[in-house]
Design a protein with these regions (language model features):
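SAM-dependent methyltransferase
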Residues: 69-141
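A short His-aromatic
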Residues: 43-45
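C-terminal lobe and adjacent flexible extensions of AdoMet/dcAdoMet transferase-like proteins
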Residues: 131-180
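A short glycine-rich, Lys/Arg-flanked "PGG" loop and its adjoining helix->strand segment in the class I
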Residues: 50-67
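Conserved SAM-binding strand-loop segment of SAM-dependent methyltransferases
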Residues: 10-23
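A short acidic, Gly/Pro-enriched loop at the edge of an enzyme's catalytic core
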Residues: 25-35
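Conserved SAM-binding loop
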Residues: 5-6
Length: 180
């Protein structure tokens, strides 16, 4: 992924750190104006403790008016109550991708495989595992780390977040810091 970023125009201007975002020692030293965890990546931390450690480590590295931005899906009742399921993710004449997953409402864990079937290549398995958390739980983790919710949208274009939103972009900051 880093190589793909570097190949893009301006990709060399983005600071990239490869490490475990739950381990403070893996994060770079210094103060940052923005720390972004995009596209459900935060949920790749598969325990509540690791998620809370990430908030604390990031809060420790923000400038006085810095922001921590988390993008993720909003767990819905269907996900939480699903148990196990198989869904068609994509289907063409030469390729089928299935999502096979199992969800546990108590642990807020989901694990699964993207199963790719092709005429030419047989079967390819792409495993995944996550711990989902509703925005309110993320807000509590932020508060425990000394951050407050500054803004929340349902999309990057600033669409207002509502109870019906399927996704969120949440920006956290230190209390009393500049709201911008």
């Amino acid at each position: 992924m880093v190589a793909r970023l570097r190949a893009k125009p301006g990709g060399d201007r983005v600071a990239v750190v490869v490490g475990d975002m739950a381990r403070a020692e893996d994060l770079p030293a210094g103060a940052f104006a923005v720390v972004l965890v995009a596209f459900n990546t935060f949920f790749s931390l598969t325990t509540a403790e690791d998620q809370a450690r990430c908030f604390a480590a990031v809060a420790d590295r923000l400038t006085a008016d810095g922001s921590f931005v988390v993008e993720g899906f909003v767990p819905d009742d269907e996900l939480i109550e699903a148990g196990s399921k198989v869904e068609v993710r994509s289907l063409t004449a030469r390729r089928v991708v299935l999502t096979v997953s199992r969800h546990d409402a108590v642990t807020q864990r989901a694990e699964g495989q993207f199963v790719e079937l092709t005429e030419e290549g047989g079967v390819r398995l792409r495993p995944w595992s996550l711990r989902f958390a509703p925005p309110e739980e993320l807000d509590a983790m932020a508060a425990a780390a000394g951050l407050v919710l500054a803004e929340r949208w349902s999309a990057w274009d600033g669409t207002p977040f509502t109870a019906a939103s399927a996704h969120h972009v949440s920006r956290y900051r230190r209390p009393g810091s500049s709201p911008a």
